UniProtKB/Swiss-Prot annotation:
Source taxon at top rank: Bacteria
MF GO annotations: holo-[acyl-carrier-protein] synthase activity; magnesium ion binding
EC numbers on record: 2.7.8.7
Cofactors that this protein relies on: Mg(2+)
Primary role: Transfers the 4'-phosphopantetheine moiety from coenzyme A to a Ser of acyl-carrier-protein.
Protein name: Holo-[acyl-carrier-protein] synthase
Record-listed Mg(2+) binding positions: 8, 55
Keywords: Cytoplasm, Fatty acid biosynthesis, Fatty acid metabolism, Lipid biosynthesis, Lipid metabolism, Magnesium, Metal-binding, Transferase
Amino acid sequence: MIIGIGNDIIEIERIEKAISKEGFKNKIYTQKELENIQKRGNRTETYAGIFSAKEAISKAIGTGVREFSLTDLEILNDDLGKPYVVVSEKLDKILRNKKENYQIEISISHSRKYATAMAIIL
């Protein structure tokens, strides 16, 4: 059973401006995400893709970012580069209220100008 589907698209230039501002990175990205971004070349597209994935997941949850913060979602990559989601204890409780054994699947893509992501919560 599908709990929710979310999609997001963002201009990479917008994220480029945002990450240059004091505090933005720590408000949006976890320490593990920031380390992972550094390992992957510190590319603006990576920041944008992760941001877009978090927004897509919040839409799939159905609440937007009202009951949790974007740092309650962590977007990491497996050994093959496939993105996966780790949720905080707080967000886990919210999701378990919807379905005990939920699963979050995401896909992230980008072009030169845009990053996009899709999320499905099963």
